[in-house]
Design a protein with these regions (language model features):
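A generic structural micro-feature
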Residues: 12, 48-51, 64-66, 85-89
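Conserved hydrophobic positions within beta-strands
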Residues: 33, 72-74
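Hydrophobic beta-strand positions in extracellular immunoglobulin-like domains
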Residues: 59-61, 74, 96
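Short, conserved beta-turn/loop elements at beta-strand boundaries and strand-helix junctions
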Residues: 77-82
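C-terminal output/interaction extensions
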Residues: 83-117
Length: 117
């Protein structure tokens, strides 16, 4: 992290490879998620929704095969910029809005397992 920038995340995020179904504003897509925390998820997409957009998410956690359905809010977006040299990780950061406690516990369990590896 460069000097002057501070990490805003309050909890640990871990790398994952998940398929995520999401829908918002009449758009229905099936994308990949590359990291997750107890508070949110990063979804790779070349055409992310704008910050503030509410999104219905559905994904299955590895190992537990637990299916999670949750409302999320886009907190930041990094759209694909094909003509730019440095355009890493196009996608959007999504904060979970109404995550059930049981689902949060399942995600935390996954995070602990991955963090130990």
């Amino acid at each position: 992290m460069s000097e002057g920038k501070r990490e805003k995340r309050l909890t640990q995020r871990v790398p994952v490879k998940l398929k995520v179904d999401w829908k918002a504003e009449g758009t229905f897509l099936y994308e990949n998620a590359t990291n997750i925390s107890e508070h949110g998820i990063f979804v790779e997409t070349n055409d992310p929704m704008d910050p503030g957009t509410m999104i219905d998410l559905q994904f299955t956690l590895p190992e537990s095969n637990k299916q999670i359905a949750v409302l999320g809010e886009v907190t930041w977006a990094n759209p694909l910029r094909p003509r730019k040299e440095a355009n890493y990780n196009p996608g959007m950061g999504i904060r979970f809005v109404n995550l059930k406690e049981i689902d949060k516990e399942t995600i935390l369990s996954l995070i602990k397992r991955i963090a130990v590896l």
